[in-house]
């Protein structure tokens, strides 16, 4: 099962993430957990989230980039759910070997994330990659959809189909491998 942990504080305003979730949702074996819908009070059900992670074959953290980071509820989710003794530390082996993909949308163009006057995309991924590796997870190449504020619907749909294809490719490789 592919588990998408989706965190967008204003999902009604996100055409890009909406398209991505629509495409992913057409696939069999995909569970989408929308954190802002599940936990509007930020009171996370840690046991339910850990159970979902335990069922997953692939975990995806999907969100818009906000100030070069994750939305606040996703950060809180990480702090609470990725607990010592469960996800890391002594006996913390629940996620060991489980693949994780970061799926992120940005308002800026791809060139905005090249190393230069701004931090490069690999630098921005480091905290998430470090978190995954600390929990014993396997970091997969991220999926990034850039320029989401100015993209026309055709471009958003094409990128969302590309996201769906990444998930299909993973499912096929996982089934055969």
Curated annotation (Swiss-Prot):
It is found in: Cell inner membrane. FMN binds at residues 8, 14-17, 65-68, 105-108. It comes from the Bacteria. Its cofactor is FMN. Its EC number is 1.6.5.2. GO terms for biological process: positive regulation of potassium ion transmembrane transport; potassium ion transport. GO terms for cellular component: plasma membrane. Its main location: membrane. It catalyses: a quinone + NADH + H(+) = a quinol + NAD(+); a quinone + NADPH + H(+) = a quinol + NADP(+). Pfam families: Flavodoxin_2 (PF02525). GO terms for molecular function: electron transfer activity; FMN binding; NADH:ubiquinone reductase (non-electrogenic) activity; NADPH dehydrogenase (quinone) activity. InterPro entries: Flavodoxin_fold, Flavoprotein-like_sf, K_H_efflux_KefF, KefG/KefF. Keywords: Cell inner membrane, Cell membrane, Flavoprotein, FMN, Membrane, NAD, Oxidoreductase. It is a peripheral membrane protein. HAMAP family: K_H_efflux_KefF (MF_01414). Regulatory subunit of a potassium efflux system that confers protection against electrophiles. Required for full activity of KefC. Shows redox enzymatic activity, but this enzymatic activity is not required for activation of KefC. Homodimer. Interacts with KefC. Belongs to the NAD(P)H dehydrogenase (quinone) family. KefF subfamily. This is Glutathione-regulated potassium-efflux system ancillary protein KefF.
């Amino acid at each position: 099962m592919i588990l998408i942990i989706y965190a967008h504080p204003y999902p009604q305003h996100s055409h890009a993430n909406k398209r991505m979730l629509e495409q992913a949702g057409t696939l069999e074996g995909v569970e989408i957990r929308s954190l802002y819908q599940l936990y509007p009070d930020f009171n996370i059900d840690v046991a339910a989230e850990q159970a979902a992670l335990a069922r997953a074959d692939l975990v995806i953290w999907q969100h818009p980039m906000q100030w070069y980071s994750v939305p606040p509820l996703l950060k809180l989710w990480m702090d609470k759910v990725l607990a010592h003794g469960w996800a890391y530390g002594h006996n913390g082996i629940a996620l060991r070997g489980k693949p994780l993909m970061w799926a992120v949308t940005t308002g800026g163009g791809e060139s905005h994330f090249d190393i230069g006057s701004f931090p490069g995309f690999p630098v921005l991924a480091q905290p998430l990659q470090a978190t995954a590796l600390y929990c014993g997870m396997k970091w997969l190449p991220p999926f990034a959809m850039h320029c989401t504020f100015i993209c026309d619907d055709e471009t958003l749909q094409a990128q969302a189909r590309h996201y769906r294809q990444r998930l299909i490719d993973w499912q096929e490789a996982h089934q055969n491998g």
